[in-house]
Amino acid sequence: MSENFRQQDTSVISPQAVPVQPEYPNAYGDEEINCIALKQRLEQFQLWLAAAFNAGSSAESLVAARSDFIDRLLRRLWVFYGFEDIPETALVAVGGYGRGELHPLSDIDVLVLSQRRLNEQQSQRVGEFITLLWDLKLEVGHSVRTLEECLLEGLADLTVATNLIESRMICGDVALFLQMQKHIFSDGFWPSPQFFHAKVVEQQERHQRYHGTSYNLEPDIKSSPGGLRDIHTLLWVARRHFGATSLDEMVGFGFLTQAERNELNECQSFLWRIRFALHLVLPRYDNRLLFDRQLNVAQLLRYEGEGNEPVERMMKDFYRMTRRVGELNHMLLQLFDEAILALDATEKPRPLNDDFQLRGDLIDLRDETLFIRQPESIMRMFYLMVRNREIKGIYSTTVRQLRHARRHLKQPLCTIPEARELFMAILRHPGAVSRALVPMHRHSVLWAYMPQWGKIVGQMQFDLFHAYTVDEHTIRVLQKLESFADAETRPRHPLCVELYPRLPNPELLLLAALFHDIAKGRGGDHSILGAQDVLEFAEVHGLNSREAQLVAWLVRCHLLMSVTAQRRDIQDPTVIQQFSAEVQSETRLRYLVCLTVADICATNETLWNSWKQSLLRELYFATEKQLRRGMQNSPDLRERVRHHRLQALALLRMDNIDEEALHRIWSRCRADYFLRHSPNQLAWHARHLLAHDSTKPLVLVSRQATRGGTEIFIWSPDRPYLFAAVAGEMDRRNLSVHDAQIFTNRDGMAMDTFIVLEPDGSPLAQDRHTAIRHALLQAITQREYQPPRVRRPSSKLRHFSVPTEVSFLPTHTDRRSYLELTALDQPGLLARVGEVFADLNLSLHGARISTIGERVEDLFILADSDRRALNPETRRKLEQRLTEALNPNDKM
């Protein structure tokens, strides 16, 4: 892994002549100590930093150069303001500045240390000193404390204590600074075990804020797991316990090998380079690699490629580096734990077998050469971990030996017959994911086992849809699948919790999950390529033909159910028949729905909501019914209409309604209306229409969730641009439209149903119902259509480009056309689409709206003015008009 990085790193740097560094501040005369002159000097220095970086200077040298420059500036100002005349006072660098690490926008944290409180005149002088630094636009954090205050505040606050531990003298009273150092490194100031525990807890809390992974697609270079803070934590703990001030000194104390020191240096160098570049493209301090910055940073680092390739290559390097930092951090903190807290020497390790023993609840090697001599023993260890619930992790020295052996493997572990048997045995065991596959991934053993896995480690996709890298997403799919075996998951995923225990071979589902995205980033259809990979894997791992074909089908079709449920008209019997023909059996259907739900949930935590759950349940049960009925037997649509009407009538009779009036309303409705609404929906509409003047518009907002969302029913004289007006108003109200059923009865009255959600995926808040109902009523009663005011897209969306694509799906009818639209998500999109339909005199009969990150992938069911499918010329015009209306290059 490290060799691959070094090759990439050298290829992106093209050294030029490094410019001469500007004059140091210690040479400035008194006449230059003013805000204007100093600001010019600082600007020159910042320009030099950027030029030197572009010319190939290392981030390490430039970070040190800025720290040195600021040191000299502060010393010059210290003299200028006469602080040398104040006895027993010192200026001390703390934080990152204390470590001598100042990136272009890093804060400059200083401590004005004194033996006793400063008097009013001295305090005023300090204030003038700090004010000048602020006027120079330096981000200065400062504190003014006596020695006693430093110690008291340090004892009370871990952050203050950490700053003091890495403090560095700039100028002033050296004896006072050394006195402070003596106190903070004494046994009474944050004893080593206490400091260690506090820093570990602090790190755990920080990791939790980032969902426990560095694989978020907009990571914080400093604070995300595996980032620079994880290296700092190691340095802080070593500094407090051993007095070590560098990684080199940690090697001297025997708690870091030369190879580990080199690896941490390599990781830090890479992270510094990215952070330095980020600071050069930002106007103010920030360490987050947000989407809108990633391309600029990648270009500054000279990553090459078409489109998003530079970003994806840079981020792949980044994620691989943070993986390595994370593994080293975890292992070394364990080693510190052993050194600092010293496990009870009287507690002897308990043998598990000839090769492994248990130290507390951690598995440990009995012979440190075992992994090198017998690589298959690596798999034996993970097999023991999945079988023995006492084992909670791997002992630190064993992790060290595992890392060493991993780097010396001559061939993938899957080429060893015993390793293959053990891998399949692991998959078949309950708890395989949490107790074996997750730690195997954490320690890069999955990569060592199957080379294909290495290709997706750190593989990101530059979009707003996928929240994690491909490997992290896959691990989360596996974890979600395993959770379906837990009854506690039932409230969130009732169908999957019911089906998962009924799967005859759940290990096949885990195998499909492992391979479902394995071919991403290779080019071509990743589903087909992944299916080919898993067939080869199945053959060498001894799966029979039936098992191999099932897993390959799941990989090839892992998107089928999601696409069908969210982007097809699943109330159309033909769609259900086509889907059922592909699925073929109830067993395959059960496997597929579990994989689909896990895949959606693991793609982005915000994607799963009650709407998607209802769609998948509806598709599952409709398919199950079709499979049980037999593929040759189509549902009787007339019988379904009759059944829906009778059930709705039964509900309405409980309200003593006027059945003659009801018959008059229903007699004017076409069959599609009854087919596409449930009896409860039909009764709800009728109940309000019977109590309403049917010549006037009506807007209803359901109080109960319908298919996971809020149903809005609109009754209004049909007219051009009605859909556009409704969609525009919903957009103004920040409603997310997910489904629309558009009907016009025989009297020309529109009977339109919309399923809407709040932006967070929840049903519409009750306190918004009245305002939205009134707003929609006003929108549909306006005499002339008023196009919605064009709003700017969100800042995130502005950095993505999605070409507008229009296609027409094959259809079984000559009465409807099915249009599939892909475009950049943008404010007012549905209203603009509706305007185009109205301009071309097309009638909309239904819509299924899917927003996938920055993309919309929508389905519209259309007919022309003669209630027929669109002819080729109309299709051509429609495609042209939609492309013009939605082209992301248009000004908005």
Curated annotation (Swiss-Prot):
The keyword Aminoacyl-tRNA synthetase does not apply. It catalyses: [protein-PII]-L-tyrosine + UTP = [protein-PII]-uridylyl-L-tyrosine + diphosphate; [protein-PII]-uridylyl-L-tyrosine + H2O = [protein-PII]-L-tyrosine + UMP + H(+). Uridylyltransferase (UTase) activity is inhibited by glutamine, while glutamine activates uridylyl-removing (UR) activity. Pfam families: ACT, GlnD_UR_UTase, HD, NTP_transf_2. Residues 711-792, 818-892 form the ACT domain. Transmembrane segments: none annotated. PROSITE patterns: ACT, HD. Residues 470-592 form the HD domain. Keywords: Hydrolase, Magnesium, Multifunctional enzyme, Nucleotidyltransferase, Repeat, Transferase. Residues 352-710 are annotated as: Uridylyl-removing. The keyword DNA repair does not apply. Residues 1-351 are annotated as: Uridylyltransferase. Its EC number is 2.7.7.59, 3.1.4.-. GO terms for molecular function: [protein-PII] uridylyltransferase activity; phosphoric diester hydrolase activity. SMART domains: HDc. GO terms for biological process: regulation of nitrogen utilization. Signal peptide: none annotated. Its cofactor is Mg(2+). Modifies, by uridylylation and deuridylylation, the PII regulatory proteins (GlnB and homologs), in response to the nitrogen status of the cell that GlnD senses through the glutamine level. Under low glutamine levels, catalyzes the conversion of the PII proteins and UTP to PII-UMP and PPi, while under higher glutamine levels, GlnD hydrolyzes PII-UMP to PII and UMP (deuridylylation). Thus, controls uridylylation state and activity of the PII proteins, and plays an important role in the regulation of nitrogen assimilation and metabolism. Has four distinct domains: an N-terminal nucleotidyltransferase (NT) domain responsible for UTase activity, a central HD domain that encodes UR activity, and two C-terminal ACT domains that seem to have a role in glutamine sensing. Belongs to the GlnD family. PANTHER family: BIFUNCTIONAL URIDYLYLTRANSFERASE/URIDYLYL-REMOVING ENZYME, BIFUNCTIONAL URIDYLYLTRANSFERASE_URIDYLYL-REMOVING ENZYME. This is Bifunctional uridylyltransferase/uridylyl-removing enzyme. It comes from Serratia proteamaculans (strain 568).
